[in-house]
Every structure is written in C-alpha cells, then in structure tokens.
Amino acid sequence: MPKGEGNVVAQNKKARHDYSIVDTIEAGIVLTGTEIKSVRAARIQLKDGYAQIKNGEAWLINVHIAPFEQGNIWNQDPERTRKLLLKKKQITKLQNDLKGTGMTLVPLKVYLKNGFAKVLLGIAKGKHDYDKRESIKRREQERDIKRIIKSVNR
C-alpha cells in the first residue's frame, strides 16, 4: 500500500490551505492502549498540531486525542507529546529539509494501515495571504471550467 493510504481517521484540511507542501513522509505514532482505541473511533484533531525533531528523535506536538470513554485511570493527557517512529536516515533527511527558512513539519492526516496508526507528515512552507488568494482564485476557475464543460456535454 503506498504511503498516505489506508483507513483515514483524521485529515488536516487547514494545513493545505495555510502551507504549501513540499514533500511528505509517513511515520508511525507511539500510542497507549486507550489512545489507539480513541484513534480508531476517529476522536483525533490535527488542526493545531506540528512535529519537531529533538535530540535525534521526532515528536508530534499539540495533537488532541480525546480520552477514551471507558478508559478511566488509563487515559493519558489528550495534548501530550507523542513520539514518531522514523528511521535515523529519515530523521537526518528531515533535519536537512527543515533547515530552510520558514519550513515546518505539519501532520496532514492520520490513518490506520495494517492495524497500526500512521501519520502523514508534510514538509511545508508557510503561505502568505496573497498566495492563499491565488489558490482560491485558481480553484474557483477550475470549478467554473468543469461546470461549463459539464453543461456543454449535456
């Protein structure tokens, strides 16, 4: 199965609006038992999340996984920092890619692949307001063209 495919649990649509994605990479997430149950129930939010590399390890920060209903004392803090599973070569590549100005690691989507939770990280550069307007304008033009073609084909 190619990267980014599987049973999609959560998507970060705002990331594609706020950032231009340069490259993507797939990583596993270290979760506790109650957290994976919440992820399978699609109770995860990526909106404010980002990833960082500290001491040669990748970490997922500010991603909210809601506490599991029947988890009682085993529930973790919903906003806790979670370790990402990447190989050393991938981490060094990410460090080199992030050295550019304005580059960041943004979680694009979380999905289940062969029973494991995976996150698709995007190496992203922030968009300016005028870039966002251009994207919206281009999207509207494509929509208009499709509408015209559809009406001509009828």
Swiss-Prot record:
InterPro entries: SmpB, SsrA-bd_prot, SsrA-bd_prot_CS. GO terms for cellular component: cytosol. Keywords: Cytoplasm, RNA-binding. PROSITE patterns: SSRP (PS01317). Pfam families: SmpB (PF01668). This is SsrA-binding protein. GO terms for biological process: trans-translation. It comes from Streptococcus thermophilus (strain ATCC BAA-250 / LMG 18311). The gene is smpB. Belongs to the SmpB family. GO terms for molecular function: RNA binding.
